[in-house]
């Protein structure tokens, strides 16, 4: 952190993130207007920067409830995720460091979706989601090498809202039905987008601040999905989305927009 306002120039850092995961969802019709469900999932992640790389494994467990009020579906849920990471850092001087650390993530969310019929098996669906996430991250210890860094544990909080609209077409056929949908969405980080600092220190040295860059508050996205539901209970779907953030600035940095692709496929059985 530049306490003395020295002109220290600028630098550009590029980061690429890859996430691969799977999840299982179970839902039980508790009553005519209420369903209860569980979500169990896991993923592998890999983040690459110019001089470092972090690989992670995560497991997620969540529960939710859905309430049906005519064309309106209300959903509330909560979950917890445990993640472990292997981090590797290199320096221009040829030194390399590694460490393992973990974090716990807790989230709660509320969602509402209204389905408005506008034609023959054609629906215009609008939705809104509000979520709160709390992350408790362990400190890091790179060992006893020269210029190895220790960091303190740190917590982060985010409050995020999302609104969107989908156009959905249901196509009945002899052995079940197919559903095609496509839409647009807007996401806003209400709280937690500002830059933060993690306290670190070289071995035997004094404390210094490590910058956690600010986040882009606004993003827009498009999505598409195809789902097949057969009379024998088999369910299959494929979906994809693309989102892009607006370039954002603060007093010490700029986040340049970078698109994000998400693709997925699922298969299940409906009892």
Indicate residue ranges for each PLM-predicted region.
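Solvent-exposed, glycine/polar-rich loop segments of beta-barrel outer-membrane systems
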Residues: 9-14, 50-52, 84-102, 136-157, ...
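Short, internal active-site loops enriched in acidic
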Residues: 43-44, 131-133, 185-189
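Transmembrane beta-strand segments of outer-membrane beta-barrel domains in Gram-negative
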Residues: 109-139
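Intrinsically disordered, low-complexity acidic/polar segments
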Residues: 47, 74, 85, 121, ...
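Beta-strand segments within the central parallel beta-sheet cores of soluble alpha/beta enzyme folds
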Residues: 77, 125-126, 180-183
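Outer membrane beta-barrel transmembrane domains
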Residues: 36, 62, 66-67, 151-271
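Outer membrane beta-barrel translocator domains of Type V secretion systems
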Residues: 1-116, 241, 246-255, 260-266
């Amino acid at each position: 952190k530049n306490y003395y306002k020295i002109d220290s120039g600028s630098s550009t850092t590029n980061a690429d993130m890859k996430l691969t995961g799977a999840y299982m969802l179970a839902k039980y019709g508790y009553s005519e207007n209420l369903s209860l469900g569980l979500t169990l999932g896991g993923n592998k992640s890999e983040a690459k920067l110019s001089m470092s790389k972090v690989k992670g494994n995560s497991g997620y467990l969540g529960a939710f409830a859905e309430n049906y009020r005519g064309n309106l579906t209300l959903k509330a849920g909560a979950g917890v995720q445990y993640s472990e990471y292997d981090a590797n850092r290199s320096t221009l001087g040829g030194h390399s460091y590694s460490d393992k650390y973990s974090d716990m993530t807790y989230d709660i969310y509320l969602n509402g979706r209204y389905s408005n019929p506008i034609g023959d098996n054609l629906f215009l669906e609008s939705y809104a989601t509000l979520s709160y996430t709390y992350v408790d991250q362990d400190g890091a210890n790179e060992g006893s090498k020269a210029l190895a860094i220790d960091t303190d544990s740190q917590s982060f909080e985010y409050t995020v809202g999302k609104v969107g609209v989908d156009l959905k077409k249901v196509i009945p056929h002899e052995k079940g039905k197919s559903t095609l949908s496509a839409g647009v969405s807007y996401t806003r980080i209400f709280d937690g987008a500002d830059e933060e600092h993690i306290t670190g220190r070289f071995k035997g040295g004094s404390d210094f601040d490590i910058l956690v860059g600010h986040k882009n508050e606004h993003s827009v996205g498009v999505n598409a999905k195809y789902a097949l539901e057969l009379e024998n209970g088999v369910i299959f779907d494929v979906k994809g989305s693309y989102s892009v953030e607006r370039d954002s600035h603060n007093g010490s940095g700029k986040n340049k927009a970078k698109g994000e692709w998400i693709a997925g496929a699922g298969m299940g059985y409906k009892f």
